[in-house]
């Protein structure tokens, strides 16, 4: 297994990080920030662990001095610093004293970007040819090397393989791990139906991919210029369209063997010339392209066919795709007139729910970004060529050169000297030795390690918390804490997959985990959680705050406000609190509350109480207060533990004008009415216990009826004016009296001795919006 970034001690180390900052440019303007954004997590990770960061990257191809003037990495500094929320230093050298001096001045957490590594290609292609001296020089600038440039992982350059071969410690960054995980899942854990869409200009670029992927897919849709080679092989006229004559034989044999899986264009958008053209359609014979015409894009009938095989068609018995891989455009997307086929692919995939979709290739990604549909795809690869070579089971030199986790440096150094990088990437970084990894034994090896890549139960909850629906961190990386200096923020669910820990989830990059499911509408759903007594108090207090009036003035506009006016106002507030259901429905969720037996009052203190929505103080409910001429010194906490619950009764009308809460087992409790003012309802405080303190507004007790337990003594106070302050002390009855009361109370269900003896947690229900 390859070393990961979490295996390294980064504190106060000079950390060389190879990134892929090869952003698309239009003049001097960056047209897509995706590659910069994807680099941020690794930089942040090193920053937070005290590393001194030296960044290397290329930008485009540099063949002449004119290219050098246009391809300076200084263009990305501002965007990088903005996304990183940290200053970024820049040195316009790839080697020299100026660069070395800047590195020596770095402090932990500092970030330094050096100039475009491909400027060295002006010196006998030193970078692209992996010049040994250049690799050694760059390696000498740091203590640790991290390769996080998946886009160049299929190339052996001085800035990846050269550095990794000459430095003591090397590891893979977060982006590379994410990429490998996504492609591994695509090829080895795909759900059927599996639809692959391949476009682009050349069959020769994708022959190996075609041969590798065809056995795994249910349908293979071929578009772009490469489709014309297959049409030509079938004897269909393609006019002056581009095709590869030397691949006709391959296309013929491929179609003969897999014709039942392959979907080719059945009509075309044509043009007489390549530039400044408008689409023309051959309505008489849509399949044929007349002479002197060029195929520029797929036609409307092909678009309809693409939609059917991606989204499904019940009439034709075609199921919606569950796994999709797309690489390469359907037409000449440089011109807006010929983007329809590619846009149709984006539209179809984005409408799927619960499917796993992977996209690679710059042109395909550009179309997705044009529609701002990135979040509707499971994974958008930063490496088009690298992703194809990964699927082809080829060795990716930039990753293969990284140290194995099990290797000592001496073993690794010996391997470097012999240049024995023979690990086949078809078995993604999971073999203990290089000899185990060959494409021939890959299937057997993968099956033998099935337990490592079992799907997590919560896998579909986003990428549930970069909550990139594209990236599901549930199946990334490995679990064990591998270094005392770094907390293990990665856990394993397959040979090369892991999950970000709480530490990383709370960083600035929670967007690394994203929700794949797209909800078409919000629904009100119940959730249930277990709470302790303290949690319930907090929840009740929060609930009361949320259902309170916004201002005192709206609650009590005047001191002369009538009791009926207050009730009407509070009911409107209640409707706002439950916008999608009536209060009667909420009341129905309150059936019966479990009680604590009188025989187990001492043990009851360790048990949590049962509450439902109806137990929370309702905004317009009136209370029955049981008064007694004599009070005892029992604390409220003891009474609460003995009586366990209040039972909501007598909810007679929808507007709750006569609602009462009976507390029949608190017959000696006493509310003493004193001063009532317009704003304060003070908390009950007795002994060592106090209920959550809140304002009169918060409790929404706009209507209050205090009644005694004795029916003959009950009297309703109507039209009271809220002009005095109430200070209420709830005093309890003696334990013996309470036990007798509960024993004699036949209107309530008493728990059996067995039920009381068994510890139990009760549940508190609330309603929340599903996002």
Swiss-Prot record:
User: What residues does substrate bind to?
Assistant: 20-22, 35, 58-61, 118, 155
One example of the protein's molecular function in GO is: ADP binding
Pathway annotation = Carbohydrate degradation; glycolysis; pyruvate from D-glyceraldehyde 3-phosphate: step 2/5
Q: Where in the cell does this protein reside?
A: Cytoplasm
Q: Which residues form a coiled coil?
A: none
Q: What is its EC number?
A: 2.7.2.3
Q: Does the keyword ATP-binding apply?
A: yes
**Cellular component annotations (GO), alphabetically ordered:** cytosol
User: Catalyzes what?
Assistant: (2R)-3-phosphoglycerate + ATP = (2R)-3-phospho-glyceroyl phosphate + ADP
- In which domain of life is the source organism classified? Bacteria
Question: Which parts of this chain are annotated as the region Phosphoglycerate kinase?
Answer: 1-406
The broad enzyme category this protein falls into is: transferase
The principal localisation class reads: cytoplasm
Q: Provide the GO biological process annotations.
A: gluconeogenesis; glycolytic process
What does the annotation say about its assembly with partners? Monomer.
| Name listed for the protein in its UniProt record | Phosphoglycerate kinase
Designated gene of the protein: pgk
């Amino acid at each position: 297994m390859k070393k990961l970034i979490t295996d390294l001690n980064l504190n106060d180390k000079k950390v060389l990080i190879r990134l892929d900052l090869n952003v698309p440019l239009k003049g001097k303007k960056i047209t897509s920030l995706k590659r910069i954004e994807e680099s941020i997590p690794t930089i942040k990770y090193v920053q937070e662990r005290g590393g001194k960061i030296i960044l290397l990257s290329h930008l485009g191809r540099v063949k002449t001095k004119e290219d050098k003037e246009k391809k300076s990495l200084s263009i990305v500094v501002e965007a990088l610093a903005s996304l990183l929320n940290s200053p970024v230093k820049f040195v316009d050298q790839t080697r020299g004293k100026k660069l070395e001096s800047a590195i020596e001045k770095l402090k932990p957490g500092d970030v330094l970007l050096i100039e475009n590594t491909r400027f060295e290609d002006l010196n006998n292609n030193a970078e692209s040819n992996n010049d040994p001296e250049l690799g050694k020089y760059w390696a000498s600038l740091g203590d640790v090397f991290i390769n996080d440039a998946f886009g160049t992982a299929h190339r052996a350059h001085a800035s990846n393989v050269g550095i990794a071969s000459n430095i003591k410690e090397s590891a893979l960054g977060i982006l590379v791990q994410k990429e490998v995980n996504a492609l591994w899942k695509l090829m080895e854990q795909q759900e059927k139906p599996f639809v692959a869409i391949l476009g682009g200009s050349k069959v020769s670029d994708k022959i190996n991919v075609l041969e590798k992927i065809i056995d795994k897919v249910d349908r293979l849709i071929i578009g772009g210029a490469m489709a014309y080679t297959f049409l030509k092989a079938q004897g269909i006229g393609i006019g002056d369209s581009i095709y590869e004559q030397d691949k006709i034989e391959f296309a013929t044999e491929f179609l003969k063997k897999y014709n039942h899986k392959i979907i080719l264009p059945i009509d075309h958008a044509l043009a007489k010339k390549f530039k400044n053209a408008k689409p023309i359609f051959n309505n008489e014979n849509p399949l044929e392209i007349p002479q002197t015409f060029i195929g520029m894009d797929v036609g409307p009938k092909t678009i309809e066919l693409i939609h059917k095989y991606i989204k499904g068609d019940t009439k034709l018995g075609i199921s919606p795709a569950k796994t999709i891989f797309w690489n390469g455009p359907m037409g000449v997307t440089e011109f807006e007139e010929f983007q329809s086929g590619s846009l149709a692919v984006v539209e179809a995939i984005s409408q799927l729910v619960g499917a796993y979709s992977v996209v690679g290739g710059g042109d395909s990604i550009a179309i997705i970004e044009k529609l701002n549909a990135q979040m509707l795809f499971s994974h958008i690869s930063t490496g088009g060529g690298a992703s194809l070579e990964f699927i082809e089971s080829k060795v990716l030199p930039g990753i293969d050169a990284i140290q194995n986790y099990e290797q000592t440096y001496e073993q690794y150094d010996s391997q470097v000297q012999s240049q024995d990088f023979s690990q086949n990437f078809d078995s993604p970084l999971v073999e203990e030795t290089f000899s185990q990894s060959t494409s021939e034994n890959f299937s057997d090896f993968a099956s033998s390690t099935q337990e490592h890549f079992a799907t997590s139960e919560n896998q579909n909850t986003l990428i549930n918390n970069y909550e990139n629906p594209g990236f599901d961190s549930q199946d990334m990386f490995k679990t064990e804490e591998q270094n005392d200096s770094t907390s293990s923020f990665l856990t394993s669910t397959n040979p090369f997959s892991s999950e970000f820990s709480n530490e990383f989830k709370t960083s600035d990059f929670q967007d690394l985990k994203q929700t794949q499911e797209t909800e078409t509408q919000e629904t009100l759903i119940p959730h249930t959680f277990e709470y302790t007594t303290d949690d319930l108090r907090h929840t009740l207090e929060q609930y009361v705050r949320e259902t309170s009036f916004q201002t005192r003035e709206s609650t009590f506009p005047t001191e002369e406000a009538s009791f009926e006016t207050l009730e009407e106002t509070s009911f409107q507030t209640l409707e706002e609190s439950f916008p999608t259901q009536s209060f009667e429905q909420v009341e129905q969720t309150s059936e019966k509350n479990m009680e604590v037996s009188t025989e187990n009052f001492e043990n009851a203190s360790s048990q949590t109480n049962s509450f439902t929505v109806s137990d929370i103080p309702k905004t317009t409910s009136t209370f029955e207060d049981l008064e007694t001429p004599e009070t005892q010194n029992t604390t409220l906490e003891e009474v609460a533990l003995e009586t366990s619950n209040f039972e909501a009764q007598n909810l007679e009308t929808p507007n709750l004008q006569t609602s009462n809460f009976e507390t029949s087992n608190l017959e000696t409790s006493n509310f003493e009415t004193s001063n009532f003012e317009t704003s304060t309802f003070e908390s009950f405080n007795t002994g060592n216990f106090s209920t959550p303190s809140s304002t009169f507004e918060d409790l929404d007790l706009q209507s209050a009826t205090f009644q005694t337990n004795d029916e003959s003594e009950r009297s309703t106070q109507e039209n009271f004016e809220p002009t005095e302050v109430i200070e209420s002390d709830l005093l309890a009855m003696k334990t013996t009296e309470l036990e007798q009361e509960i024993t004699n109370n036949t209107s309530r269900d008493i728990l059996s001795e067995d039920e009381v003896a068994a510890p139990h947690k009760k549940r508190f229900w609330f309603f929340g919006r599903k996002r």
